[in-house]
Amino acid sequence: MSIKISAIALFMLSFTVFVNGIPFFLTKGRIDTCKTLTGETIKIGESWHDPNSCSVYYCEVNSLGAMLIGKTCATVFYPSNCREEPGTGLYPDCCNKVVCGEEEMVVYPYEERSLRRYYFSKF
């Protein structure tokens, strides 16, 4: 009898440890909000601009729950006769601009967040 009770107690302890090991966003908090890097709470569909980097985050939901999806400036390779100038403001205005001679080009990501391609647009 004592062995059976010990086995049941061990099973219950193992189950409790397993359940508490599930990722935080699946077991705690709300599934309709996201927490930003600075601790603010935003709702699904809302965006948040990171004050410490040139990026924007969107609160989205998928099969795992609510999560932040981020966008930041593109890494740009340009000819030697061009240079980068810093941008100002919030994303995407804070992204560096590429200046080649008298022409200025701004690098924009495609609107579809799943694609990691970028295009150039004359300013």
From Swiss-Prot:
What's a Gene Ontology MF term here?
toxin activity
Annotated tissue distribution: Expressed by the venom gland.
**Mostly located where?**
secreted
Keyword Signal appears in the UniProt entry: yes
Question: What UniProt keywords are attached to this protein's entry?
Answer: Disulfide bond, Secreted, Signal, Toxin
Signal peptide region: 1-21
Any one Gene Ontology cellular component term annotated for this protein: extracellular region
Subcellular localization is given as: Secreted
Q: What PTMs does it carry?
A: Contains 4 disulfide bonds.
The record's comment on protein family reads: Belongs to the scorpion La1-like peptide family.
What name is this protein filed under? Venom peptide MmKTx1
Native species: Olivierus martensii
Q: What is the lineage of its organism?
A: Eukaryota, Metazoa, Ecdysozoa, Arthropoda, Chelicerata
